[in-house]
A protein has these predicted regions:
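Generic alpha-helical secondary structure signal
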Residues: 18, 110, 117, 216-217
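Extended amphipathic alpha-helical interaction segments
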Residues: 85, 89-197
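Alpha-helical oligomerization segments
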Residues: 182-221
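Amphipathic alpha-helical coiled-coil segments
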Residues: 66, 73, 120, 166-169, ...
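Leu/Val/Ala/Ile-rich N-terminal alpha-helices, chiefly Sec-type signal peptides and the beginnings
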Residues: 3, 7-107
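A broad, low-amplitude sensor of folded, mature protein cores
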Residues: 1-14, 18, 152, 167, ...
Length: 221
């Protein structure tokens, strides 16, 4: 096991109970270190007991919180629907006045999510989680167990991978928002070549229509 030696090094195996709990915590920690935390489900079931369960729960909840940040950025990506954004109902006098505010909102939200993620993979934040946990007897021992797992090189690599996934998802979002802004600019600059009829954008110039759908395809690709 990846962590078994390290965990034993900070343990005091004075009873069968402690050995069993440490083995289980090690097993669960190794699973988290080896799995794809972004694309695979994090098993939040707590298999240990007493103070060990607090350590296990803190580890799993911490990783889940980071993953949830990634999922929030992905949700923003999925909510960019060009057909809705540039629907006839949003067109007014050849302009789409609500687009700029949507772009700014999504940029700001995604920036905040990325900043949260970067903060969570810092050592101070990682340790704050266990220091705030309701550990009672032999707190230093259980904090050391948590520290051995969460500050290990293997877990640091996992955290960096998660942060990279959040950053990549945000970059993808920014690219989409740039295209949305470009479509808005294109439609407004060529407003004389389209109008609204029966809740649809109707183009009067074939070349402009083709260019518009090319931009839409770029957004959806």
């Amino acid at each position: 096991s990846i962590l078994i030696v390290a965990l034993i090094a900070v343990s005091f195996l004075y009873s069968k109970f402690n050995k069993t709990q440490l083995d289980t915590l090690t097993e669960e920690s190794n699973k988290l270190i080896q799995q794809d935390l972004i694309n695979e489900e994090i098993n939040e079931e707590i298999r240990t007991q007493k103070e060990y369960a607090i350590v296990e729960k803190t580890i799993k909840e911490y990783l889940t919180n980071i993953k949830n940040i990634y999922l929030e950025v992905e949700k923003l990506n999925s909510q960019i629907n060009a057909e809705e954004i540039f629907s006839a109902s949003n067109a007014e006098d050849g302009k789409f006045n609500n687009v700029d505010s949507l772009v700014d909102e999504y940029k700001e939200k995604s920036k905040e999510y990325l900043e949260q993620c970067i903060s969570l993979i810092e050592e101070d934040s990682i340790m704050e989680a266990i220091n705030n946990a309701e550990l009672t007897a032999k707190k230093d021992y259980y904090v050391d167990l948590y520290k051995t797992v969460m500050l290990s090189d293997s877990m640091k690599n996992q955290l960096l991978k998660m942060e990279e996934s959040v950053e990549k998802s945000r970059d993808n979002l920014i690219d989409k928002l740039t295209i949305v802004s470009n479509i808005k600019k294109f439609l407004e600059e060529n407003s004389r070549y389209w109008n609204v009829k029966d809740d649809q954008l109707i183009f009067t110039n074939t070349n402009i229509m083709v260019q518009y759908y090319e931009l839409l395809n770029e957004l959806n690709s």
